[in-house]
């Protein structure tokens, strides 16, 4: 029985150490993913485009109202798009004007999912986070249809729980979902 207790304690200790290590890797991977997204967004920071935003004024308050929908002028006239609270909370950029500008930029200069994955993998290696990574990108078009791309294509990882999700664009129409497996 003493041998069984010793083995059980050793196994429990290994399990707890691994669980703690995975939690640390997950935090490092989340931070690296967000940094990689910012690196891709920053490549477009100096690009000038015409973007008209109405309804904005110079007055702000400390308690900015979180929008539950936005209005966008399309070829079909003014369209109302609902923004889920979850999407807004996980949006890379919160300020309406900047989200609108970024949404217009991404229409003209889309992010390369392959480049984003390469940058994320590089940051993971720098942080010594092992394992495999995958990015699922979902774009919601003006008619609210979704188009999904996974890089690399690996159905087994997509079925697992995601590590983190970030949204870009005025309507939060660009969804980037990060997956890792150790």
PLM region spans:
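Extreme N-terminal signal-anchor transmembrane helix of membrane signaling/transducer proteins, especially
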Residues: 1-13
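The feature marks either
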Residues: 9, 23-180
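Juxtamembrane transmembrane-helix termini
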Residues: 13-19
């Amino acid at each position: 029985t003493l041998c069984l207790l010793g083995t059980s304690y050793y196994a429990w200790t290994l399990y707890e150490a691994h669980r703690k290590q995975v939690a640390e890797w997950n935090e490092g991977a989340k931070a690296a993913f967000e940094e990689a997204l910012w690196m891709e967004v920053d490549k477009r920071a100096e690009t000038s485009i015409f973007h008209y935003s109405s309804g904005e004024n110079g007055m702000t308050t400390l308690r900015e109202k979180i929008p539950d929908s936005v209005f966008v002028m399309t070829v079909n006239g003014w369209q109302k798009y609902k923004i889920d609270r979850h999407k807004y909370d996980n949006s890379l950029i919160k300020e309406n004007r900047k989200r609108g500008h970024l949404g217009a930029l991404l229409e003209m200069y889309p992010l390369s999912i392959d480049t984003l994955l390469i940058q994320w993998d590089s940051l993971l290696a720098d942080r010594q986070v092992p394992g495999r990574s995958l990015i699922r990108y979902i774009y919601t078009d003006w008619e609210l249809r979704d188009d999904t791309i996974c890089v690399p294509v690996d159905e087994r990882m997509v079925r697992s729980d995601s590590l983190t999700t970030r949204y870009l664009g005025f309507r939060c129409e660009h969804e980037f979902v990060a997956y890792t497996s150790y």
